[in-house]
Amino acid sequence: MKIRIILRKMSYENSKHRRILKSCLITWFSNPKELHLTNPNMTYPFKFNQWMNLSYKGQNTETWVAFLGDWVVGMISLKQISEEKRGHLFHLYVDKQNRSQGFEQKLIRKIEEKMKEHNLNILTLNVVPENSKALALYKKRGFNIIDSNKKKITMSKNV
């Protein structure tokens, strides 16, 4: 049986969406390793306001959330850098119980669609070196390493 997942655009500026996102993020990031792999700039324990201030305040971003029925199972965000015709993928996360079922791929495809709609040609992302599963996923999706150091690997792909 094929699992049906619905992607919905959500905004941190919408109070209802913010409540939903906050609840999910607090649950997902109760584990410091999960938080570090998703956003190494965050400190543990997870603080929602810090999350918003670091990544979503005054940014030209959109966030897509994966729903399995009424349950939020994942999310992804895109920052548009129009003057460079570039988008930056960040905060791709799927909860542990729903990983490796194609949800990550579907979320990335959604971002690639949005890139085309916004006339953005280059998609970049950062990943921590110890996140081998994410690295493998991004390579499978056609991303190439363009820079790396001990703290992060930067990848890019033409869309």
Task: Show the residue positions of the predicted features.
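A short, internal acetyl-CoA/4′-phosphopantetheine-binding micro-motif in the GNAT/acyltransferase core
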Residues: L92-R99, V128
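Residues forming the Rossmann-fold NAD(P)(H) cofactor-binding site
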Residues: Q105
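Conserved GNAT acetyl-CoA-binding A-motif
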Residues: I108, M115-N126
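Conserved active-site tyrosine of GNAT-family acetyltransferases
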Residues: Y138, F143
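Acetyl-CoA-dependent GNAT
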Residues: K2-F90, D95, I108-K110, K114, ...
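Conserved beta-strand-loop-alpha-helix junction that forms the acyl-donor binding cleft
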Residues: L125-L135, K151-S156
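Conserved G/P- and acidic residue-centered "switch" motifs that form tight phosphate/ATP-binding loops
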Residues: G102
